[in-house]
UniProtKB/Swiss-Prot annotation:
Gene (UniProt): rpsC
Job of this protein: Binds the lower part of the 30S subunit head. Binds mRNA in the 70S ribosome, positioning it for translation.
Matching HAMAP family: Ribosomal_uS3_B
SMART domains named in the record: KH
Family classification: Belongs to the universal ribosomal protein uS3 family.
Name of this chain's protein: Small ribosomal subunit protein uS3
Native source species: Mycolicibacterium paratuberculosis (strain ATCC BAA-968 / K-10)
KH type-2 domain mapped to chain residues: 38-106
Quaternary state and interactors: Part of the 30S ribosomal subunit. Forms a tight complex with proteins S10 and S14.
Keyword Membrane: no
NCBIfam families noted in UniProt: rpsC_bact (TIGR01009)
InterPro entries: KH_dom, KH_dom-like_a/b, KH_dom_type_2, KH_sf_prok-type, Ribosomal_S3_C_sf, Ribosomal_uS3_bac-typ, Ribosomal_uS3_C
Disulfide bonds: none
Biased segments, Low complexity type: 238-280
Amino acid sequence: MGQKINPYGFRLGITTDWKSRWYADKQYADYVKEDVAIRRLLSTGLERAGIADVEIERTRDRVRVDIHTARPGIVIGRRGTEADRIRADLEKLTGKQVQLNILEVRNPESQAQLVAQGVAEQLSNRVAFRRAMRKAIQSAMRQPNVKGIRVQCSGRLGGAEMSRSEFYREGRVPLHTLRADIGYGLYEAKTTFGRIGVKVWIYKGDVVGGKRELAAAAPAGAERPRRERPSGTRPRRSGASGTTATGTEAGRAAASADESTAAGQPAEAAPAAEPQSTES
Protein backbone atom coordinates (compact mmCIF):
# COMPACT_ATOMS: atom_id res chain seq x y z
CA MET A 1 0.00 0.00 0.00
CA GLY A 2 1.34 3.39 -0.98
CA GLN A 3 0.16 4.99 2.27
CA LYS A 4 2.17 2.64 4.51
CA ILE A 5 5.32 1.57 2.66
CA ASN A 6 8.53 3.56 2.45
CA PRO A 7 8.23 5.69 -0.73
CA TYR A 8 11.88 5.12 -1.64
CA GLY A 9 11.72 1.31 -1.53
CA PHE A 10 8.30 1.28 -3.21
CA ARG A 11 9.75 3.01 -6.31
CA LEU A 12 13.14 1.28 -6.31
CA GLY A 13 14.16 0.56 -9.90
CA ILE A 14 11.32 2.71 -11.30
CA THR A 15 12.12 6.30 -10.35
CA THR A 16 14.76 5.76 -7.64
CA ASP A 17 18.17 4.09 -7.68
CA TRP A 18 20.04 1.96 -5.16
CA LYS A 19 22.07 3.83 -2.53
CA SER A 20 24.50 0.92 -2.16
CA ARG A 21 26.05 -0.33 -5.40
CA TRP A 22 28.19 -3.47 -5.22
CA TYR A 23 28.08 -7.19 -5.94
CA ALA A 24 28.98 -10.00 -3.54
CA ASP A 25 28.39 -13.72 -3.43
CA LYS A 26 29.35 -15.25 -0.10
CA GLN A 27 30.12 -11.92 1.59
CA TYR A 28 26.70 -10.41 0.95
CA ALA A 29 25.58 -10.44 4.60
CA ASP A 30 28.91 -9.02 5.76
CA TYR A 31 28.70 -6.14 3.28
CA VAL A 32 25.13 -5.30 4.30
CA LYS A 33 26.16 -5.22 7.95
CA GLU A 34 29.14 -3.05 7.04
CA ASP A 35 26.95 -0.59 5.11
CA VAL A 36 24.65 -0.22 8.12
CA ALA A 37 27.68 0.45 10.35
CA ILE A 38 29.00 3.10 7.92
CA ARG A 39 25.68 4.96 7.82
CA ARG A 40 25.32 4.76 11.59
CA LEU A 41 28.84 6.13 12.07
CA LEU A 42 28.15 9.10 9.80
CA SER A 43 24.74 9.85 11.32
CA THR A 44 25.80 9.76 14.98
CA GLY A 45 28.99 11.78 14.68
CA LEU A 46 27.78 14.50 12.33
CA GLU A 47 24.37 15.63 13.60
CA ARG A 48 25.05 19.32 12.90
CA ALA A 49 26.35 18.73 9.36
CA GLY A 50 22.90 18.25 7.82
CA ILE A 51 23.58 15.00 5.97
CA ALA A 52 20.83 14.35 3.43
CA ASP A 53 22.06 11.12 1.87
CA VAL A 54 24.96 8.64 1.91
CA GLU A 55 25.86 6.53 -1.14
CA ILE A 56 28.25 3.58 -0.97
CA GLU A 57 29.99 1.93 -3.92
CA ARG A 58 32.43 -0.96 -3.63
CA THR A 59 35.15 -2.42 -5.82
CA ARG A 60 37.47 -5.30 -5.07
CA ASP A 61 39.92 -3.30 -2.94
CA ARG A 62 38.29 0.10 -2.46
CA VAL A 63 35.15 1.61 -0.92
CA ARG A 64 33.76 4.91 -2.21
CA VAL A 65 31.50 6.90 0.11
CA ASP A 66 29.57 9.94 -1.18
CA ILE A 67 28.19 12.26 1.51
CA HIS A 68 25.48 14.72 0.43
CA THR A 69 25.42 17.49 3.02
CA ALA A 70 23.98 20.97 3.39
CA ARG A 71 27.01 22.16 5.42
CA PRO A 72 30.15 20.80 3.77
CA GLY A 73 32.37 23.02 5.91
CA ILE A 74 31.46 21.06 9.04
CA VAL A 75 32.22 17.73 7.35
CA ILE A 76 35.54 18.93 5.91
CA GLY A 77 36.67 20.78 9.02
CA ARG A 78 39.52 23.25 9.35
CA ARG A 79 42.17 22.39 6.76
CA GLY A 80 40.46 19.05 6.15
CA THR A 81 41.08 17.62 9.61
CA GLU A 82 37.50 16.39 10.07
CA ALA A 83 37.46 14.72 6.64
CA ASP A 84 40.74 12.95 7.44
CA ARG A 85 39.33 11.71 10.74
CA ILE A 86 36.19 10.37 9.04
CA ARG A 87 38.26 8.65 6.36
CA ALA A 88 40.49 7.03 9.01
CA ASP A 89 37.45 5.76 10.94
CA LEU A 90 35.92 4.31 7.77
CA GLU A 91 39.18 2.59 6.79
CA LYS A 92 39.42 1.10 10.27
CA LEU A 93 35.82 -0.12 10.01
CA THR A 94 36.06 -1.61 6.51
CA GLY A 95 39.71 -2.64 6.40
CA LYS A 96 40.01 -1.23 2.86
CA GLN A 97 41.06 2.00 1.21
CA VAL A 98 38.23 4.56 1.39
CA GLN A 99 37.57 7.30 -1.15
CA LEU A 100 35.52 10.03 0.55
CA ASN A 101 33.53 12.48 -1.60
CA ILE A 102 31.72 15.40 0.05
CA LEU A 103 28.93 16.89 -2.10
CA GLU A 104 26.96 20.03 -1.27
CA VAL A 105 23.15 20.07 -1.34
CA ARG A 106 22.02 23.19 -3.19
CA ASN A 107 18.40 23.41 -1.97
CA PRO A 108 18.15 22.00 1.57
CA GLU A 109 14.53 23.20 1.88
CA SER A 110 13.49 20.70 -0.82
CA GLN A 111 15.25 17.67 0.74
CA ALA A 112 12.88 15.62 2.90
CA GLN A 113 15.57 14.32 5.26
CA LEU A 114 16.91 17.81 5.97
CA VAL A 115 13.40 19.20 6.49
CA ALA A 116 12.64 16.43 9.00
CA GLN A 117 15.91 17.09 10.80
CA GLY A 118 15.16 20.82 10.97
CA VAL A 119 11.72 20.22 12.49
CA ALA A 120 13.19 17.78 15.01
CA GLU A 121 15.84 20.30 16.08
CA GLN A 122 13.15 22.91 16.71
CA LEU A 123 11.14 20.44 18.79
CA SER A 124 14.26 19.70 20.86
CA ASN A 125 14.59 23.45 21.48
CA ARG A 126 11.03 23.59 22.91
CA VAL A 127 9.42 25.21 19.85
CA ALA A 128 5.69 24.49 19.47
CA PHE A 129 5.25 21.55 17.11
CA ARG A 130 2.50 23.18 15.01
CA ARG A 131 4.61 26.27 14.48
CA ALA A 132 7.64 24.19 13.47
CA MET A 133 5.59 22.12 11.02
CA ARG A 134 3.97 25.14 9.36
CA LYS A 135 7.28 26.97 9.06
CA ALA A 136 8.86 23.95 7.36
CA ILE A 137 5.94 23.68 4.94
CA GLN A 138 6.12 27.36 4.02
CA SER A 139 9.87 27.21 3.40
CA ALA A 140 9.55 24.10 1.22
CA MET A 141 6.65 25.41 -0.88
CA ARG A 142 8.71 28.48 -1.83
CA GLN A 143 11.01 26.21 -3.86
CA PRO A 144 10.08 26.03 -7.56
CA ASN A 145 10.56 22.26 -7.82
CA VAL A 146 8.32 21.38 -4.84
CA LYS A 147 4.68 20.66 -5.72
CA GLY A 148 3.49 19.22 -2.43
CA ILE A 149 4.64 18.38 1.09
CA ARG A 150 3.33 16.48 4.08
CA VAL A 151 4.84 16.74 7.59
CA GLN A 152 3.81 14.39 10.39
CA CYS A 153 4.78 14.39 14.08
CA SER A 154 4.10 11.44 16.40
CA GLY A 155 4.63 11.15 20.14
CA ARG A 156 3.78 13.08 23.28
CA LEU A 157 3.09 16.31 21.43
CA GLY A 158 3.22 19.34 23.69
CA GLY A 159 4.00 17.12 26.68
CA ALA A 160 0.58 15.45 26.63
CA GLU A 161 0.02 12.32 28.71
CA MET A 162 -1.22 10.30 25.75
CA SER A 163 0.77 10.14 22.53
CA ARG A 164 -0.86 10.98 19.20
CA SER A 165 -0.03 11.85 15.60
CA GLU A 166 -0.71 15.07 13.73
CA PHE A 167 0.18 16.06 10.20
CA TYR A 168 -0.12 19.04 7.88
CA ARG A 169 -0.22 18.84 4.11
CA GLU A 170 -0.04 21.39 1.32
CA GLY A 171 -0.23 20.67 -2.41
CA ARG A 172 -0.33 17.16 -3.91
CA VAL A 173 1.45 14.14 -2.43
CA PRO A 174 0.40 11.09 -4.56
CA LEU A 175 1.92 8.24 -2.56
CA HIS A 176 0.44 5.50 -4.74
CA THR A 177 1.65 6.89 -8.11
CA LEU A 178 4.81 5.00 -9.04
CA ARG A 179 6.07 7.62 -11.50
CA ALA A 180 5.86 10.34 -8.83
CA ASP A 181 9.19 11.64 -7.55
CA ILE A 182 8.64 11.64 -3.78
CA GLY A 183 11.36 12.22 -1.23
CA TYR A 184 11.01 10.75 2.26
CA GLY A 185 12.76 11.68 5.48
CA LEU A 186 12.59 10.42 9.06
CA TYR A 187 14.19 11.89 12.17
CA GLU A 188 13.65 11.60 15.93
CA ALA A 189 13.57 14.58 18.27
CA LYS A 190 14.83 13.96 21.81
CA THR A 191 12.77 15.99 24.28
CA THR A 192 12.42 16.03 28.07
CA PHE A 193 9.15 14.07 27.90
CA GLY A 194 10.29 11.44 25.38
CA ARG A 195 11.06 11.08 21.71
CA ILE A 196 8.96 12.57 18.91
CA GLY A 197 9.17 11.07 15.44
CA VAL A 198 9.10 13.45 12.47
CA LYS A 199 8.26 12.17 8.97
CA VAL A 200 8.34 14.28 5.81
CA TRP A 201 7.12 13.51 2.28
CA ILE A 202 7.99 15.94 -0.55
CA TYR A 203 6.51 15.62 -4.05
CA LYS A 204 8.61 17.09 -6.89
CA GLY A 205 6.62 16.08 -9.98
CA ASP A 206 6.37 12.99 -12.16
CA VAL A 207 9.31 11.20 -13.77
CA VAL A 208 8.59 10.16 -17.37
CA GLY A 209 11.32 8.47 -19.41
CA GLY A 210 13.96 9.19 -16.78
CA LYS A 211 13.26 12.95 -16.81
CA ARG A 212 11.21 14.98 -14.36
CA GLU A 213 8.02 16.36 -15.87
CA LEU A 214 7.73 20.11 -15.34
CA ALA A 215 4.55 22.16 -15.47
CA ALA A 216 4.45 24.05 -18.76
CA ALA A 217 2.26 26.86 -17.46
CA ALA A 218 2.70 30.24 -19.13
CA PRO A 219 3.73 33.12 -16.85
CA ALA A 220 0.97 35.40 -15.66
CA GLY A 221 2.40 38.50 -17.32
CA ALA A 222 2.93 36.95 -20.75
CA GLU A 223 1.46 38.88 -23.68
CA ARG A 224 -1.23 37.31 -25.82
CA PRO A 225 -0.70 37.38 -29.60
CA ARG A 226 -2.32 40.40 -31.22
CA ARG A 227 -4.39 40.24 -34.39
CA GLU A 228 -3.04 42.44 -37.17
CA ARG A 229 -5.39 44.78 -39.08
CA PRO A 230 -4.96 46.37 -42.54
CA SER A 231 -2.87 49.52 -42.66
CA GLY A 232 -4.74 52.82 -42.78
CA THR A 233 -7.80 51.62 -40.87
CA ARG A 234 -8.82 52.24 -37.29
CA PRO A 235 -11.17 50.24 -35.06
CA ARG A 236 -14.61 51.77 -34.67
CA ARG A 237 -15.73 52.83 -31.24
CA SER A 238 -19.28 53.58 -30.11
CA GLY A 239 -19.44 56.76 -28.02
CA ALA A 240 -17.35 57.09 -24.92
CA SER A 241 -17.85 53.56 -23.72
CA GLY A 242 -14.83 52.32 -25.66
CA THR A 243 -16.52 49.21 -27.08
CA THR A 244 -16.27 48.31 -30.75
CA ALA A 245 -19.55 49.06 -32.55
CA THR A 246 -19.42 46.33 -35.19
CA GLY A 247 -21.58 44.03 -33.08
CA THR A 248 -24.61 46.38 -33.05
CA GLU A 249 -27.17 47.04 -35.78
CA ALA A 250 -25.96 50.61 -36.30
CA GLY A 251 -22.37 49.46 -36.43
CA ARG A 252 -23.11 46.86 -39.11
CA ALA A 253 -24.94 49.48 -41.17
CA ALA A 254 -22.04 51.92 -40.84
CA ALA A 255 -19.56 49.23 -41.83
CA SER A 256 -21.58 48.31 -44.96
CA ALA A 257 -21.83 52.02 -45.86
CA ASP A 258 -18.07 52.41 -45.72
CA GLU A 259 -17.56 49.34 -47.90
CA SER A 260 -20.06 50.65 -50.49
CA THR A 261 -18.42 54.09 -50.53
CA ALA A 262 -15.01 52.53 -51.04
CA ALA A 263 -16.40 50.48 -53.97
CA GLY A 264 -18.06 53.56 -55.60
CA GLN A 265 -21.67 52.42 -54.96
CA PRO A 266 -24.35 54.45 -53.16
CA ALA A 267 -24.88 53.40 -49.61
CA GLU A 268 -28.21 51.96 -48.52
CA ALA A 269 -29.97 53.67 -45.67
CA ALA A 270 -30.28 51.72 -42.51
CA PRO A 271 -33.83 50.62 -41.69
CA ALA A 272 -35.55 52.69 -39.07
CA ALA A 273 -35.98 51.07 -35.73
CA GLU A 274 -39.53 49.90 -35.09
CA PRO A 275 -41.18 51.39 -32.03
CA GLN A 276 -41.84 48.89 -29.25
CA SER A 277 -45.07 49.12 -27.33
CA THR A 278 -45.80 47.61 -23.97
CA GLU A 279 -49.32 46.54 -23.19
CA SER A 280 -50.59 47.28 -19.76
